[in-house]
Every structure is written in C-alpha cells, then in structure tokens.
Amino acid sequence: MNNFVKQVASKSLKPTKKLSPSDEVISLNECIISFNLDNFYYCNDGLFTKPINTPEDVLKSLLIMESFAYEKMIIKGLIKILISRAYINDIYFTPFGWLTGIDDDPETHVVIKIIFNSSLISIKSQVIEYLKPYNVNNLSVLTTEKELSINTFNVPDSIPMSIISFFPFDTDFILVILFFGVYNDSYCGISYISPKERLPYIIEILKPLMSEINMLSDEIGRTSSIRIFNSTSVKKFPTNTLTSICEIVYSFDESSFPTPKTFTPLNASPYIPKKIVSLLDLPSNVEIKAISRGGVDFITHINNKRLNTILVIAKDNFLKNSTFSGTFIKENIIWKGIYTYRIIKSSFPVPTIKSVTNKKKICKKHCFVNSQYTTRTLSHIL
C-alpha cells in the first residue's frame, strides 16, 4: 500500500511544512492470511516479471484478475470482510504476484497482508467461516513478529492538498489521500475510502478545504494526474489527528460536512472496468467499435450498443501489427482445421485470410477427438 501511495502521489506537489509528532502513538500488529484454492491450476514460471509495480501495473493486475472470475469472487469477498476489521497492506495472487508492492513470492496461491489493532481471534474466526464453503486448503492466519508504531500529529495551520485514486484492494471504492506536511522522510495526513459513486460528492466537499485536488485518471493502458481544483481560500479541515501516510484508511463520513448543492461534471474516472477478450469470442457479423490508446486496443461498442465494461483486445500474431481504431465486422471460420476468425470489413487496415474454402469443415480438437459433439471453451476445442 505504501508503494502504491508513493507512486500515485509522485507527480503532485505536496505540502512540505515540518510537523512534530504528538505523544500519542498508534500500535499495530501484522497478520498474514494465506491459502491455496482448490482445483486451481495455473503456472507462469519462467515468464512472470514485474520489477516496479506502478499504478499502471496495478491496473493491469486488476484486469488480469477479471480472467479468474471464481477466484476473484472469493478474494474480493474476503477483502470486504477484512476492510471492516483491519487495514490491508497488500494482496498476492499467483497470476499477478503482489498487487501493490514488491516482495518475495510465497508458496500459496493467495496471500493477504493486514495490519490490525483489534482481536486476532475475531478476525481469524471470520476468515475461517467465510472461506469454509470454498474448499480452500493450507489456510493459515498468523501474526508476524512485525510491530508497527504509527506517529500521530496535530492538524497544522497549513493548507492540505488531496489526491484521489482507485482503491487498489477493492475498486468499488475510491481512495482519498490528504497531505498536510512532513515528518522526517514521511508525508503526514489522513486517508479515506468511499464508494466510487460518491466521487462527485467527495470532490465538492473537499473543494472549500483543499488548496488543490488531483485525481489519478484511468486512461486504459496508462494513467495521468488531473488537477480538478485549486484555491488559496480554504476552511480548516474538520479533524484533530493526522498520521504518517500508511495503510491506515478510514471510511469517509459525509455527515461531518455540509451537503454539496452543485456538482462539477467529470470527464475522467479513477477506474474503468475492463476485461481481456479474444476476437474469437466476439459475435460474428455485427459492427464492433474499437479505440487504440497508450498501446492498448479496446472495444467500446458492439452492434451500436455501448458496453458497461471495456473489452481489451488480446491480439494473436496474425494481427499483432494492426491498430484497432475504428469499426470492423468479423466472422468465425474453420481454416485449415483451425477454428479462427477473419475480419470481413474494417475502417482500418488489417491482414486478411484470402481463402476460407474447407469442404469438410473439420476442426482439430484438443481432446474428445472421437466425439461427434463439438464446441469450445475459452481456451480449447473439444
């Protein structure tokens, strides 16, 4: 989490007022939750590499997670339970490694690092009860020897600034980080999460309280920092205590602030839902609209209907040098015994399969080769 905040805030000018810690210190313990998923078979040995873990890497990891719908459901449900009882430090899942930080790879499919100051017995019982229906194995819920002491600070007279991004551990929420000053090498402030649909309300609430509001915008394949608001005339933020910026996040309580009466339209979003798709899986003989941005080609409309989830195109070698920017129509075919597709019409240049003649139209199968019943999974013909 610390690495994520550092990366998100790296391009913003933050307050540099020197703060002095108060006498109060927040003491926290670390807990590691780990388990294997039953009947989960996956291996990326010799292929996987992720040296930095930028916000773009985090968004890519969340995109990869969409390809594992069942596993995502389990992990996301557990995260929602933990958010109400502890602070999430990081998540590990075999296909994408550590979600926000850099660490050694564990031996289990899933690891969740949390820090907490409540009862471990209560947390452990909730975890065990939640995972019971999913037949996970090698479940471990253990505290480490790592103890964290988080300094607290009184709110200074300096004007804070805010950065808003997606919350990496649950994209149903946004992360709101307020920066007030520095202590030693650490920035000090307070962090909140709020349901993503409350973003316009949060911005309007913060405007009279911040010198500047920046938002990390998801632009599919890249991110950018957008300045939403800046001012020199602000009111004092209604909180008494700050901490070093860390894993500690609070739920944003809108009832502590006046209700906004107007809202500024936003043409950007911290997180855009997306899913990887093969062109083979798209419907045949209908118009499809695609856009290319930041080296990523993605689909926004099918048959003149706007999609709720952006579809990121997974290209094969045949189309690796083509840029999907415009409209196209495709059809699935059996070509030389292979189930594939061809683009039959497009507003942009693409290579074509000249001949699709196949009298027998027999497709090579990966298994069940003697069966007269033929179909495909997402990966195989059978």
Swiss-Prot record:
GO CC list: virion component
A GO term, aspect molecular function: DNA binding
Top-level taxon of origin: Viruses
Induction info: Expressed in the intermediate phase of the viral replicative cycle.
Pfam families associated with the record: Pox_I6 (PF04595), Pox_I6_C (PF12562)
Residue spans crossing the bilayer: none
InterPro entries xrefs: Poxvirus_F5/I6_dom, Poxvirus_I6_C
Keyword Signal: no
One of the GO BP terms on file: viral process
Compartmental location: Virion
Swiss-Prot/TrEMBL keywords: DNA-binding, Virion
Family according to the record: Belongs to the orthopoxvirus OPG082 family.
Described function: Binds to the hairpin form of the viral telomeric sequence. Might direct genome encapsidation into the virus particle.
Protein name (database record): Telomere-binding protein OPG082
Species per Swiss-Prot/TrEMBL record: Variola virus (isolate Human/India/Ind3/1967) (VARV)
